[in-house]
Amino acid sequence: MALIMKYIDSMHHYMDKYGDPRTKDWPLMSSPFPTLALCLGYVYLVKVLGPRLMENRKPFQLRNTLILYNFVQVVFSAWLFYEIGISGWLTGHYNFRCQPVDYSNHPKTLRMVHACWWYYFSKFTEFFDTFFFVMRKKTSQVSTLHVIHHGCMPMSVWFGVKFTPGGHSTFFGLLNTFVHIVMYTYYLFTAMGPQFQKYLWWKKYLTSLQMVQFVAIMVHAFQLLFIDCNYPKAFVWWIGMHAVMFLFLFNEFYQSTYKATKRRRAAAAEARRLAAEEAKLQNGSAVSSNGSAITANGHHGKNGSVHHHSNGSATSNGTSLLSNGVGSNKAADYYVRGDLPAEIEITQRQPSSRNQVQ
């Protein structure tokens, strides 16, 4: 126990010595342990405690809550993008090739430092993405990728705000807040209901946008390994490897989702083809049967009653023919879901008119 306390004291001494004095007394900045505790608590809550509490409960209906939350996140992300951009990246003050950290108390510099802290704070607000999934029992969306992404980010950004608030690494925040504007706009429209689905034609590009973001961050960070720049190499590797890890995770998710969608579409197409073939065979049998009935009527022309009823049978089969044609799409459901359409089942059970006359 004494050894652990000695290690903690030495770590605090190191952080006091090398940490940025401007952020030393800001909320959650004096020590990494509160942030670490919040991240571990988040993982436990969404993977263990939350699903256990919701196991025997009905999913919460959070439509209005989600609309409000996503709207706030869009506004918050837009404000962060503006603050990070106006403090350097979008004004020409920052250099995309190499931007050392400015440790002065210049107003524009302090504006960037404050933007960095608020960006760090935003990583905690994003925990609610997962909390709402758990409350709505959308457990499939609480994936390993999702939990790793949200669970690691606050701790990662904490180190940036503690030691290098500003400079080259804030390019990460600039791109990330832009992507979040797009992402939470999509979530907002989705929460507002089906009538807004027609405006979401671009949703298939969201994962691609995420991957482009990580490639840009990776290239922007790793370029400092090949040029002389007064920026800590440890943070170059930290940010670059984060980008590489998330790039591979998102790419794996993209590929698995794309392949699964492709398989579902192929299965649906095959089901429609089989249903059409079966309907065609059934219709052929119905036409052949009608032909026999009409021939039989010709041989029994004196019996007007029989002729009338037999022709009625042909008409009935004609109706069945149309019904089978219309029902081919519903028959496809049988191959996909295993539920036999009602009208086909009734047609199969119904005796012919000729048998009724006999």
Curated annotation (Swiss-Prot):
Would the keyword Methyltransferase be found if you checked this record's keyword annotation? no
InterPro entries hit by this protein: ELO_fam (IPR002076)
Recorded catalytic activity of this chain's protein: a very-long-chain acyl-CoA + malonyl-CoA + H(+) = a very-long-chain 3-oxoacyl-CoA + CO2 + CoA
The region annotated as signal peptide is none
From which residue to which does any coiled coil extend? none
* Membrane topology listed for this record: Multi-pass membrane protein
Q: Which domain of life is it from?
A: Eukaryota
**Stretch list, region Disordered:** 285-322
Query: What are its E.C. numbers?
Result: 2.3.1.199
- Give the principal location in a single coarse category: membrane
A cellular component term, taken from the record's GO annotations? endoplasmic reticulum membrane
Q: Where is the composition biased (Basic residues)?
A: 299-310
Q: What is the annotated role of this protein in its UniProt record?
A: Could be implicated in synthesis of very long chain fatty acids.
Q: What is this protein called?
A: Very long chain fatty acid elongase AAEL008004
The source organism is Aedes aegypti (Yellowfever mosquito)
